[in-house]
Structure formats: structure tokens, C-alpha cells
Amino acid sequence: MTMPPDAIPKNVASERPWIGAMVLTPIGVVRSPIADRQEMPTFGVPARVEIFPEFADGLRHLHKHTHVWILAWLHEADRTRLLVTPRGVSDPSEAGLHGVFAVRSPTRPNPIALTAARIERIEGTCLHLDRLDFVDGTPVVDVKPYFRSRDAIYAARNEQIGRPANRQALLESLLLQAEHFHGERCGGLAFGARIVEHFRSTFLDFAEAWGTHAIVPEDAGCLIDAVMTLVGATPGRGTLGFHGAPFVRFIRDDRVYNYVLLEPGRRWSSWTALPADVILALPEEELFRASSTLVRAK
């Protein structure tokens, strides 16, 4: 892979003569059940990366890491545009356009993409990964270990760019975010994700929940992890509190939102002990009762 001459402005080529010699050597290829980019789910599917034999030595000691960054060359991408309308943005006007360096669109001058993935297992030169959003046959240009000490920035925030396609899409996104923080998908985590999904879709019109204060049951550790992750509340900043009652409370602007467990006589922990798939399958009216109250200034 070399940079095509017609993609290099003449003034840039004269000032930086080395730029035309930039070369990317594919080190492997993606093997995925999805071959059409239009059919790829937002968060990808289980896939594998086959490293070419001549790069096998580069995999030595990769087993020390649970997650990796996969850098790929999006060979089907449009390299001619610098402005795009991101997924989820309904405004087709100039106001809806974003620069390609401000979004994760495959459209960009150098279509290098990166995705973090969990290593399920390594078989020879084949990496089996929990999910990749690259289509079958995508060239891989690099593999790097994911380091918690330098790659995880828990204080990072992003202004919302687009609107989730629907409630299910939002729930899937929240579950993945919470699982990345907590380490596994359990009942308590799923319960927390369902509460936050309802809160955002019903009361916030799908907007992000950053800046929300939360009060959570003190004995529901997995649910606490979900709420911390998904609304950005923490004890250290005074935005996360605890109590002994079976309900979650969100406080935002001039309103209070209560989520009360709908199973009288049962402890909250008995719900969170259920498997995640059970929590996700139950109708929300069987899990909680939600209400919103205006807080009047005194």
C-alpha cells in the first residue's frame, strides 16, 4: 500500500519529499461472516485476524494481553471527502456536516481504522476476537496490545454527535460500555443498563446523561458499576450517593427521576443475581416503576 501520487498536493510533495515513499505493508487479513459493509452491525461481530506467516514472530507473548487494537486499511472507503454527515445525524444541511477527523467515519484521506477487541483465543497465527466491525477480507496493517494504564481515560467525555437508531440500539451500546468497565455481563449490570436506557430514551429524548447525579442501592455492586459508567457519576465528585432502599434516583436540572423495584418483599440483590439474559428479556414494567417529579425552588 503506497500513497497514490495524485493524492499528494504538489506543494506538500515539494516540502516533504519523503511523503511519496510512505508504504504500508499488510500483516494479515480479517476473516468475518460479514462481507458487505452495509450489513455490518454497529458494534461488529465475532471475527478472526489471520496473521501472515512471515509476521508470526510478532505475535510472541501476545498472550500476556486480554485485549488488542486492530488497525486496518478500509480499502473500500471514499478518500476524497473531508466533510460527512455522521450516522444518527438527521440534519442534512451544512449544520449537520462534521469533519472526518471529528468522527469515526471510514471516509477519510487515509482510511486507517482501529477497533479494540478482546482476544478469545490464539491458534497459531490466527487471533479469534470477540468482535470486529471490519468486513471479510479487510487488510490488517498492525496489531497493538491494549494497555489499561495508558489507553483507558475514564474522565474522557464526548458531546453527542448522532441519535441512536432506536431503544434497542441504545441498550446494546450501554451494555457494551458497562461490560467494558465491569469486566462481564451479569444480571446487575444488565439491570443498570436497562434503567439508564429507559431514563435516556423516555426522559432525555435519547440525549447523553452526563452531569446527572445518582443515588443507588448500597448492596448492588454490579448495578453501581453500570450507573457509574453510563451516567458518569462518582462518589469522589459528589455525584453518586448510596442508600439502603430498593430504588435508583437520578437528579438532573430541576427534576428528580425515581426507578422503584416492582417486586415487594424481595431484596434488590435477588434481582441482580439473575442471569443477564433473563433481565434483558423481561418487560420493563415487571422490573421497575419510573416517575419524574419537578423540584420546586424554595
Q: For each of these PLM feature ranges, what is it?
A:
Residues 165-185, 196-298:
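Non-transmembrane, aqueous-exposed alpha-helical and coiled segments at domain scale
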Residues 2-115, 122-165:
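Glycine-rich, low-complexity intrinsically disordered segments
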Residues 100, 118, 247-249:
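Residue-level detector of beta-strand face positions
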Residues 48-84, 187-232:
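Short, well-structured hydrophobic secondary-structure segments
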